[in-house]
Amino acid sequence: MLRRHFLSSALAAAAASLFARGAFAAGQAMDGMQGMEGMEGMDDMPDMKPAPAHARHGKPAPGPASALAAADALPAGAPLAALRVLANESREPGVFRATLVAQPVARALLPGAAPTTLWQFGADTQGPAVGPLIDVREGDAVEIRFVNRLPQPSTIHWHGLPVPPDQDGNPSDLVAPGATRVYRFTLPKGSAGTYWYHPHPHMATAEQVFRGLAGPIVVRAADDPLAGWPERHLFVSDLKLARDGAIAPNDMMDWMNGRQGQFALVNGARRPRISLTGDERWRVWNGCSARYLRIAFDDGRPFAHVGTDGGLFDAPREVASLLLAPGERAELVVRAGDRASHAVLTALEYDRGKMAMAMAMSEAAHGSLPPDPALPLADVAFEPAAPRALPARLRAVPALGEPVARKEVVFGEQMDMAAMMRAGAHGRPAGMRFMVNGATFEPHRATLTSRRGEIESWTIRNETDMDHPFHLHGTQFQVVEREIDGETTPEPYRAWRDTVNVRKGERVRILTTQTERGERMFHCHILEHEDLGMMGTLKVV
């Protein structure tokens, strides 16, 4: 039974009539709901000072009626830019040493508008605003110096990498503004895959990511069967801009459903052009705060799915579409074909059950917002080329074995409308709680405890009315089966993942193990939900 906890239901009728009628229309028109800066922060959240909503050279903040820029206001159609690559400062074999500086950078984005101040890794004002690609190999000793030039504390979380707990950028390990921290870890054999990095300070993760702080990681293996293939990187993010070029603050609907900017970007650009002159290996990242990407070509042409978060799996799978929840990654093989053609890489319509305001205000109000419509990501021109031989077997993914312990994670939510209607500080919504096992996140409180090296079976149960992507730090896991509406479906293939979507009313069972003692986080990867408490701590002993 799906359960959403409602408090102060006496407000429902009046509140629903006030808000529900215009909520979806306003979202579709992208007028936003900008004037929510006065909402009370949650009592159990640390005091993170948000950046000013305008964040632009002392310009006035957008007023409550400030509208968003039109969905076609950003230029489109430029050739897809290659990602910047983080330079290795070391000359020692097997050592990768580099520096990442997080800082505000003004960039000219919207024609006719003032420069937009992004937060990014590096000072570049041209080229992709995405953080630089960290390109490393299994066995490398990695040492990255992080310099925080932001107005907030921050961290770097190495999403999916098997790094020690004290090197993983957990929210309890903050780097103060103006401070420096060095992260050190070694990449073990078998860790080749497609990863990414982003901040993880509690109650500021969403803001720091939507302002631009995220970047890709590729870990390579010496025995990669696709090493000789041309490789293309597509880092998908989104951006929510006001008409004057300012990054718009979160409104109540952003906090409730997760923020989706009106601009979907690939390597920092809107709808770029890709020219395919032969078969290619693509690595695709969903670096959005909340947007789901059901990627496909608009003409239905198939492609091969060859890898997940943690790298290649056993054999290629031919598919016509592939769902990537926020935080997920995929490796694909895209064929040029035997004749010239064109297709649009598209994020197809997907219904993740986003709440309408009326749902939040009344237990009797059922339904949700319409599905996100299809969205073009890139235009792809295919030039004919001889096909490359794709190996029938890619990489063995051995079964983890029988579990010796079992865990359960339950996603839930609670809306207190009396609190949500009160004015407060910092734009944080009071009374909106996203929970794990009935509680919101508290630093250092162990939600679950595991023993190092033990194989465990985890069941992730979604008792809310919308999808939530589950992410577990410090390891990769294997999805075993999914159960919804009383029907259990075994996972059709074995793969390494660190993020998996859990649909409303669904139970997903995974097998996992942790190799080092310490604190690991697990949470929903809709970043607003994570910030509002849908996160737990795993204590590994």
Region locations from a protein language model:
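Active-site pocket scaffolds in enzymes
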Residues: A26, A113-P115, G160, D166-P171, ...
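N-terminal export signals
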Residues: H5-A26
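Short, surface-exposed ligand- or partner-binding patches at beta-edge/loop junctions that are enriched
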Residues: Y195-H198, D338-D351, T515-I526
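Short, charged beta-turn/beta-strand-edge "cap" motif at the junction between a beta-strand
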Residues: N148-P151, G287-S289, A336-D338, E463-D465, ...
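Histidine-centered copper-binding motifs that mark active-site loops
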Residues: A26-G27, G32-P326, L332-V333, G353, ...
